[in-house]
From Swiss-Prot:
Keywords: Coiled coil, Golgi apparatus, Lipoprotein, Membrane, Myristate. It is found in: Golgi apparatus membrane. InterPro entries: Allrgn_V5/Tpx1_CS, CAP_dom, CAP_sf, CRISP-related, SCP_GAPR1-like. The keyword Acetylation does not apply. Residues 30-50 form a coiled coil. Homodimer. Interacts with CAV1. It comes from Mus musculus. PANTHER family: CYSTEINE-RICH SECRETORY PROTEIN-RELATED (PTHR10334). This is Golgi-associated plant pathogenesis-related protein 1. It comes from the Eukaryota.
Length: 154
């Protein structure tokens, strides 16, 4: 297995998240060393199997998780931009969880405070990225999406 997430990569992911979050008027995230470690460990596990799948919820406590895979070495901004691009499929008039918008909603979830990031390269050169969010977003209780995923400010 190859390269792991660098401080620069983690900061790129954080910066992009916080720029997008500012557009929605929600507080910035802070990098968390513990979440970075956990995300890094899981990205390395994904790279070793070359299978992209979410970790069991029981193994990540109250954390949410976004995953990304590419056949090349991804930048932090590339990953965040791809996740955020799901906004085009999100219906702010009928807020809620859908599988095609979950990366976007996790990124801008208002009540999330911390993020951890991991990146690992597989033997074939592909890269696996894991973002862990605390506390988790995408909670489907009544009114939670309306409260936590505001539309971008004009």
């Amino acid at each position: 297995m190859g390269k792991s997430a660098s401080k620069q990569f983690n900061n790129e992911v954080l910066k992009a998240h916080n720029e997008y979050r500012a557009q929605h008027g929600v507080p910035p995230l802070k990098l968390c060393k513990k979440l970075n470690r956990e995300a890094q460990q899981y990205s390395e596990a994904l790279a070793s199997t070359r299978i992209l799948k979410h970790s069991p919820e029981s193994s990540r406590g109250q954390c949410g998780e976004n995953l990304a895979w590419a056949s090349y070495d991804q930048t932090g901004k590339d990953v965040a931009d791809r996740w955020y691009s799901e906004i085009k499929s999100y219906n702010f008039q009928q807020p809620g969880f859908t599988s095609g918008t979950g990366h976007f909603t996790a990124m801008v979830w208002k009540n999330t405070k911390k993020i951890g990031v991991g990146k690992a390269s597989a033997s074939d050169g592909s890269s696996f990225v894991v973002a862990r969010y605390f506390p988790a977003g995408n909670i489907v209780n009544q009114g939670f999406f309306e409260e936590n995923v505001p539309p971008p400010k004009k």
